[in-house]
Amino acid sequence: MQKKNLKDDLTILVCSCDAYADLWNPFFTLFKKYWPFRDVPIILNTESKNFSFDGLDIKCIHSPSEKRYGKRMLNALSNIKTKYVLLLLDDFFLRKPVSEENIFQIINWMKSDKNIAYFSCEPSPTYASYEVNKYPGFKRVPPASDYTLNMQAAIWQTKILKEFWRPSATPWEWETIYNPLILKHPEHKFYCPIHSKDSFLDYGHYAYGDIWGVYRGKWVTEDVDPLFKKENIEVDYSIRGIYPEKMVFKNESVDTISSVSSIYAETHLGNSSVKSLGDIFARLKKFCEIRSFLELPFYIGYEVHRIIKTILKKSMLDNYFTYILKKERKRFLSSNK
């Protein structure tokens, strides 16, 4: 396995914003402790604030007048000079030492095949087996799988990551409505861990549907408080508050959806007396203020409808939606060339 100075190949991109500056000290405290390559450059993507941490090479990339997430992401990526980038979010708090061997191995695998887009830390929810263990501990994500584009930690080929972003995209839109863009590039290959234990970073996301770190802008203290106490990290939880409730979305019935004020996650609706999609949408709009893109898999009997829903840009009215079914992806691609 070829080894050389990793800083020539890899940059760390930490996606954040000024409003989350209180996360930076605990994030970089743990990053410095558990990340083995101190000389690898780090880009902190935020609007206007500056930050430094002793022993780490951090450069803040600012977009003070730009509110669009996609535009800020493209600006940050344009400042990355290395071929590969490790994508991280500001609440991905490392829990264990990162293996040098694993990182070098992934970089060398990517060098050996220029069509590899990423090696992710997130096991894919798909049950399909595809190129399992071609790269030990990983499997290839099947073409056109949902959430192939995602904001989980991953080592990306910088050029390909930049290729998939759009200036107006939010993170939620990018993971869902823009996911069909991968069909325009069938040559690209995406790999994910076979199991969580195979991930090359441990940042606390252990099972599909878990919430950890920061959720809806508030601390998930069930996750972070034991970690911060173990690591002797002091955090003022009052700055952003504590998330008061557990995840309520799994196995939620349409008949009880009134308990949910808004939805930003995949919602499983089952065992409902409501039989038509029209009735479901009417029920959701009655009880939920939905202002951002989301994807809802509806389980009605044995039939699965995957509906992609987004508010039309011309109006902020919650009643205006566009629906893109899987079978309509070709039309979507042709309109986004």
Spans of model-derived segments:
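Conserved nucleotide-sugar donor-binding
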Residues: 82, 149-165
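Short aromatic/hydrophobic "clamp" motif used to bind/position activated sugar donors
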Residues: 85
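Conserved donor-nucleotide/metal-binding helix-loop-beta segment in metal-dependent transferases, i.e.
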Residues: 98-119
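N-proximal low-complexity "stem/linker" segments adjacent to membrane-targeting elements
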Residues: 1-25
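Short beta-strand-to-loop element that shapes/binds the nucleotide-sugar donor at the catalytic cleft/hinge
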Residues: 117-132
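Short, acidic, metal-binding catalytic loop of nucleotide-sugar glycosyltransferases
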Residues: 29-39
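Active-site-proximal specificity loops/subdomain of glycosyltransferases
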Residues: 45-81
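C-terminal catalytic/acceptor-binding lobe
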Residues: 169-335
